[in-house]
Amino acid sequence: SAAAQSKSSVYKPWSHGQLKVSKENRYLMNADGTPFFWLGDTGWLLPEKLNRDEAAYYLEHCRQAGFNVVQVQTINGVPAMNFYGQYSMIDGFNFKNIDRKGVYGYWDHMDYIIQKAEQNGIYIAMVCIWGGLVRSGKMNVEEAKAYGRFLGERYKDAPNIIWVIGGDTYADRNTEIWEALANSILAVDENHIMTFHPFGRTSSATHLNNKEWMDMNMFQSGHRRYGQKKGDGDTSVTGLEEDNWRYVEEALSMTPLKPVLDAEPSYEGIPQGLHDPAQPRWRDCDVRRYGYWSVFAGSCGHTYGHNNIMQFLKPGTPGGYGADGIEKPWYKAMQDPGFNQMKYLKNLMLTFPYFERVPDQSVIAGTNGNRYDRAIATRGKDYLLVYNYSGNPMSVDLTKISGAKKKVWWYSPKDGKLSFIGEFDSKITPFTYDG
């Protein structure tokens, strides 16, 4: 049938083996050596807010938009409650009787979501428990061990799982609980990679890079614009808030070297600074910038987010962060430009020899700009890419890659279209975008 045909044509990365770190230690790949470029959508409340039909619709449209990872809050409460009124815990952290005959329980629904994601070629990056719950004392070390064993046993054979410890929390706090959770999962599940989702404007690499259970690093560049401070004790240097490429450079300078990505940049449609609805909203041009900046700086992929999608706003339900489910429910937000433009970044990176790629800012000749005027370059042996957000004139050192003559194109992050500029000698060459 046509339906069966379309399902069979879905690309499933795990058909190339388990997800793992490449031998260069900077990127991800499947076991047979096929490159895996992480392109994530933020679906935090997917397990709690959506029913079966809605979850299937969401995951299918994520696939159509090019996403191959969805980040979820596995539980956002102790207990969490889902669309069907089912709780994630019915006997605390004792999961012995969690599967009840004749009851479509919380974890049955989670199973369904993971299976639907599998059918769409999507990994579920499971933030096991949101960090605020641990900070407020809702899970101790022994409970973390029990929960980790439960998760590991239940999902060790699912091909499309990525474990995420933490959850918008500081990597140097509650460490014994996070360690217990991570190690109890790995005691029963050696099939999946693991990482840590940190607090805003922090990186897991700062405190966890040496941990054996950490296969890759995440940072959360956060939602603030340049110079925007909340007065919450944030120690980040003011004036650099949007420079998410800096987190990549810092992580890739560490030993041991591990892949890294921005797991939470500014969301499309969310107020700048997050909490004040009167502030301007981040737009598609902004979410594109964070993607290209961090990937060209050397990250192994990128996660996108949308204000109305991550909380799955529906008409008649209260929303946070200045979002309105009547004005724009989650399914309408999936039509927004940023959601549908991120695939052009993934397509671009997978076009070229993948594992040889390095960030190289010496490609930019002369003085580079600051803030939005900063160009960022990455290259392989015979190709180079420069992202120039502001479109200012720039000089590019074409000697950095092989060949006496260089063919040059403009590439549009809005639609993935190429425009041929011409062929140039191998030397420092000025370019000015005239589009």
Where are these regions (language model features)?
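Short beta-strand segments
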Residues: 164-166, 195-198, 218, 261-264, ...
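Bacterial Sec-dependent N-terminal signal peptides
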Residues: 1-7
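Active-site mouth of glycoside hydrolases
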Residues: 11-228, 233-243
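Short, electropositive alpha-helical surface patch
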Residues: 124-125, 142-151, 279-281, 318-332
